[in-house]
Design a protein with these regions (language model features):
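Secondary-structure boundary elements
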Residues: 1-46, 57, 140-145, 152-170
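Active-site-proximal helix/loop microenvironment
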Residues: 49
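Hydrophobic alpha-helical segments
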Residues: 14-17, 52, 66
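Hydrophobic/aromatic-rich core segments of domains that either
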Residues: 54-139
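A broadly tuned "polar low-complexity/structure-edge" signature
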Residues: 69, 87, 150, 162-164
Length: 171
């Protein structure tokens, strides 16, 4: 119902994606006592979540209208991780969207932008957990996992050594 209502108010696919971004900005709170994977149902009921949970809501809304979307995970030099989304439109390519910056840009001004100094570099595209979209069958995202080791220099720059890559599409 939510996806259809947003779609009906949108001019085209990119307008729909921006309206989904604004929906998450207005309807969900960023922050969770315990970070980590939570079900989509949990996030929808509680109207809050961490970066991955809020990205999952955005991604699911896009996929409900057959717009390709995926999770991206970045590793920061301080050791923390951050998750945001990408979605694909033929005339534009992959467009980044970080719904957690919505509090600073509630007018949608951050839509389609990413600050890599805050997000770090990408170590994973996709999350391999099945996503249950209310009454529809389970869907899952692609998974790319990298085994890596990080060493810090005196200048606090991270060096990454990628030793293995495992890919599995549509688990």
């Amino acid at each position: 119902k939510i996806s259809k209502a947003i779609w009906d108010e949108s001019k085209d696919a990119i307008d729909y994606a921006k309206n989904c971004y604004l929906f998450v900005a207005k309807q969900f709170e960023y922050g969770e006592k315990e970070s980590g994977f939570k079900s989509l149902d949990y996030t929808l009921i509680n109207r809050k979540g961490d970066c991955g949970n809020l990205s999952s809501v955005f991604i699911t809304l896009l996929r409900m209208q057959d717009i390709p979307a995926r999770h991206l995970m970045g590793f920061r030099p301080d050791g923390s991780l951050h998750v945001w989304a990408d979605f694909y439109l033929q005339d534009y390519g992959w467009i980044p969207v970080d719904v957690t910056y919505k509090h600073d840009y509630t007018d949608g001004g951050y839509f389609g932008k990413i600050k890599f100094k805050h997000n770090g570099f990408i170590v994973q595209r996709g999350i391999g957990h099945p996503i249950n979209v209310l009454d529809s069958p389970k869907r899952s995202t692609g998974l790319q996992t990298y085994t890596y080791q990080v060493a810090y220099t005196k200048e606090e720059r991270a060096k990454v050594y990628i030793s293995r890559k495992v890919e599995c599409i549509e688990v």
